[in-house]
């Protein structure tokens, strides 16, 4: 008698490539800049019995909740080993959990990680003073209805001018984003934990979908 096969179905997001860049970025922000110091990085050899899981990244959030980004590999073992990768985004709170989309995951993360405009920036902008803080996670605000204050600060931050196209500030922040990911690729966990080098500037985070290359 043939043994009955049980299936466990969970929503996942396909990844067009490998997850090394994602792992390197997490380690860079955890050990080099310290911005993700509280985040737990669990590599595949510490996951345990879940052999299809290549990593777990656990982001502690407010009020005892947390967000887990779980990476999967070799999702079609019946066809032999294939370089197929995907991630699962799950939000946990006590005895409850639910899967979330990348945009919701960005909003949850930005509530605890990566700096945003401070409460005093609106007054500084009205007085014509220099803005001292910026939003380093702009993709987390997409899909929301922004306040007029936030829109005004975004205009000041990006220095928008309809006749000049993309501002120098926005270009610089995009370069900073690429630089962060490029540095993350060179991240060496063993060397960085005791390197003694000064912390890098606050990181501009482009969002989970862009970093992971999620194919919706």
Swiss-Prot record:
Chain positions covered by the region annotation Disordered: 161-201
Keyword annotations of the record: AIDS, Host cell membrane, Host cytoplasm, Host membrane, Host-virus interaction, Membrane, Phosphoprotein, Ubl conjugation, Ubl conjugation pathway, Virion
Subunit structure: Homomultimer; in vitro and presumably in vivo. Interacts with viral Pr55Gag precursor and human APOBEC3G. The interaction between Vif and APOBEC3G is species-specific, which may play a role in restricting the replication of HIV to humans. Forms an E3 ligase complex by interacting with human CUL5 and elongin BC complex (ELOB and ELOC).
UniProt GO BP: viral life cycle
Induction: Expressed late during infection in a Rev-dependent manner.
Domain notes: The BC-like-box motif mediates the interaction with elongin BC complex. The HCCH motif (H-x(5)-C-x(18)-C-x(5)-H) mediates the interaction with CUL5.
UniProt membrane topology term: Peripheral membrane protein
Comp. bias (Basic residues): 170-188
UniProt name for this protein: Virion infectivity factor
Motif extent (BC-box-like motif): 147-156
Sequence positions bearing Phosphoserine: 147
Motif (HCCH motif): 110-141
Description of post-translational modifications: Processed in virion by the viral protease.
Primary role: Counteracts the innate antiviral activity of APOBEC3G. Forms a complex with host APOBEC3G thus preventing the entry of this lethally hypermutating enzyme into progeny virions. Functions as an adapter molecule, recruiting APOBEC3G to the ubiquitin-proteasome machinery. Targets APOBEC3G for degradation through the assembly with elongin BC complex, CUL5 and RBX1. Binds viral RNA and affects the stability of viral nucleoprotein core. May play a role in viral morphology.
InterPro entries assigned to the protein according to its UniProt record, in alphabetical order: Vif
Subcellular location: Host cytoplasm; Host cell membrane; Virion
Taxon lineage: Viruses, Riboviria, Pararnavirae, Artverviricota, Revtraviricetes
Modified residues (Phosphothreonine): 98
Entry keyword Ubl conjugation: yes
Residue ranges, annotated region (Multimerization): 154-167
Example of a GO cellular component annotation carried by this entry: virion component
């Amino acid at each position: 008698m043939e043994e009955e096969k049980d299936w466990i179905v969970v929503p996942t997001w396909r990844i067009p490539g490998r997850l090394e860049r994602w792992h390197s970025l997490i380690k860079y922000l955890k050990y080099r800049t310290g911005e993700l110091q509280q985040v737990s990085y669990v590599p595949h050899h510490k996951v345990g019995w879940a052999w299809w899981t290549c990593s777990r990244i656990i982001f502690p959030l407010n009020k005892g909740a947390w967000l887990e980004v779980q990476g999967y590999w070799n999702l079609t073992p019946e066809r032999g080993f294939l370089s197929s990768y995907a991630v699962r985004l799950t939000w946990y709170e006590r005895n409850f959990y639910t899967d979330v989309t990348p945009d919701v995951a960005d909003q949850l993360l930005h509530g605890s990680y990566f700096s945003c405009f401070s409460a005093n920036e609106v007054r500084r902008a009205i007085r014509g003073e220099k803005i001292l803080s910026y939003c380093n996670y702009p993709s987390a605000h997409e899909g929301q209805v922004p306040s007029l204050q936030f829109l005004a600060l975004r205009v000041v931050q990006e220095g928008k001018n309809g006749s000049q196209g993309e501002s120098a500030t926005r270009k610089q922040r995009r370069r900073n984003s690429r630089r962060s990911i490029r540095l993350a690729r060179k991240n060496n966990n063993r060397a960085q934990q005791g390197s003694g080098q000064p912390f890098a500037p606050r990181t501009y985070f482009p969002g989970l979908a862009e970093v992971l290359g999620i194919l919706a």
